[in-house]
Structures are given as structure tokens and as C-alpha cells.
Amino acid sequence: MKKILLIVLLLNFMCLAQELVIGEERVEPGIVFIFEGAVKDHIMPMGMHLDEDQTHIHIEARVNWDEINIPEGTPRGGFVPYLHITAIVKNQKTGLQTFIDLLPHINLVDNFHYARNISLPGGIDDLYSVTFNIVPPTHIDLALHKDWLNSYGEALLKGQSFSYKSVYFGEICRARRN
């Protein structure tokens, strides 16, 4: 009976795990990036986003302060706003690629995150290379106080680029939201 219960619980957990972690990175001064492929979703306002039925996946970057070794006064695990994040998804078989601007989103699962519903540039069972580019906020987007300047310099963080190869989105493409 215990084995059956364990199997049922495991299957339920697997059904609920509808996000593919593409990569995780930590950059100074204590910012954690979690890049994911998630199940596509209905996103508003509709005039700024593709219809759910025209896309394959919801590509996202969860960007939060770490829990440790972060600047004084920083909310542990809090969302990091004002970043400009793009992604390039390239089909490894055909070379076709798509460029995406990830925009701030909010939901009841991840709360604030950067994301976009996208159509893959090829088949859902193809392998893809994914590159995420992070551009820090401009001086128009974010003003810095003297204490930050003295401790961390003239930017929130340095520009970053993270690349991942052989990403398989097939399972996420076939999954549906509850």
C-alpha cells in the first residue's frame, strides 16, 4: 500500500512540474537568474502578446535577490526590476532562430518574472540553443544613491549573457495548464 501511495504522489508531482529549468546563474551583487521553458498561457493585454494558440512555450527568466550575501537593505528573494532581458532561441538542426524581448509578468505561481509566449523556430521535438542576454537598467530607468555608488559602482549589475545547448522543449509544448 505504501508503494502505491508513493507512486501516486510521484505521478501527481510530475504532472504539476510544468516548467523546464534551462539554467540557473548567480551574479554579483547577489542576483539569481533561473531560466525556464514553461507551459504557454493566456497573457494580457492581448494586443501586446501572441495568442496562446499561436505559440508553443512560455519562455521566462525568474530574477530575484539571493537569500544570502546580498547588499544591505535588500529584500531576500525579492524580484529584481528594471532589467532588459532578451533571448535568442536557435534550432540546432536548421539554424533558424527567433529573437524575444522578455517583459515583466506577474502570476500566482512565480509572482513577478520576465517572460513571453513564443513559437519555436522549428519542430517541438527539435533541440535548441538558447541565449539569454541581460542588460542592466539605464540611468533613466534606475537612479542610484551615493551609498550604492560607493559600495557597488555605477550600475545595478554588469551586462551578462548565458547560453545553453541541446534544450528539449517537447514535453513542455505538449503540456497544458490546469
Map each language-model feature to its residues.
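Short, compositionally biased P/S/T/A/G/V-rich stretches that sit at domain boundaries
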Residues: 18-53
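Short amphipathic, basic-aromatic surface patches that mediate peripheral association
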Residues: 57-78
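Extended low-complexity, serine/threonine- and proline-enriched intrinsically disordered segments
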Residues: 77-97
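Solvent-exposed serine/threonine-rich low-complexity stretches and specific carbohydrate-binding patches
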Residues: 98-108
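Aromatic sugar-binding surface patches on proteins
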Residues: 108-117
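Short acidic/polar inter-strand loop motif in beta-rich domains
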Residues: 134-149
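Compositionally biased low-complexity segments at domain edges in trafficked proteins
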Residues: 160-178
